[in-house]
Amino acid sequence: MYQVLKKKKPEVYALGQHISMSADKARRVIDQIRGRSYEETLMILELMPYRAGYPIFKLVYSAAANASYTMASNEANLVISKAEVNEGTTVKKFKPRARGRSYPIKRTTCHITIVLKDISLDDSESIELNLLKKPRWKKNSTAMAYYDLHNRGGLWDKK
């Protein structure tokens, strides 16, 4: 079975790298918006009291701008299909302390990926072509074999 796909891809993404925030704090916000529509996501992010809401809001807005530019799609048809947060690099500093000692400070960063999908461009628009194929010979070494363990004595034939 062969598929002829349209040139338009139904997904666009926005990637934010090296955002100075813990990945766990960003995941708390990302889990609330995953799978929701674009307009509903913007309302949720505007009212959320967390600091992670603003960078994620900017990424969702940027992904919607990418969708309207590349696919000429309407914002009402966009849904967040995938949203993930990965840990980024850790910035390590030293803070001077008493008696000439130093104290390490670790600033964590994260990478956030937002993928928007246009639900008006669905997979049902792809055309499937079933072409007749010549039957090919199967190799015996790679073919799957069925072993009947019950009639051949099974695993417990020796004691």
Curated annotation (Swiss-Prot):
Specify the superkingdom.
Eukaryota
Q: Does the keyword Metal-binding apply?
A: no
Kindly indicate whether the keyword RNA-binding belongs to this entry. Answer: yes
**A molecular-function term among this protein's GO annotations:** rRNA binding
Q: Return the GO cellular component terms, semicolon-separated.
A: chloroplast; large ribosomal subunit
The subcellular location is: Plastid, Chloroplast
Q: Tell me which Pfam families the record gives.
A: Ribosomal_L22
Q: Name the InterPro entries on file.
A: Ribosomal_uL22, Ribosomal_uL22_bac/chlpt-type, Ribosomal_uL22_bac/org-type, Ribosomal_uL22_CS, Ribosomal_uL22_sf
Q: Sorted alphabetically, which keywords does the UniProt record give? A: Chloroplast, Plastid, Ribonucleoprotein, Ribosomal protein, RNA-binding, rRNA-binding
Note the subunit structure. Part of the 50S ribosomal subunit.
The record's similarity note reads: Belongs to the universal ribosomal protein uL22 family.
Protein name (record): Large ribosomal subunit protein uL22c
Q: Which organism is it from?
A: Ipomoea purpurea
- What gene makes this protein? rpl22
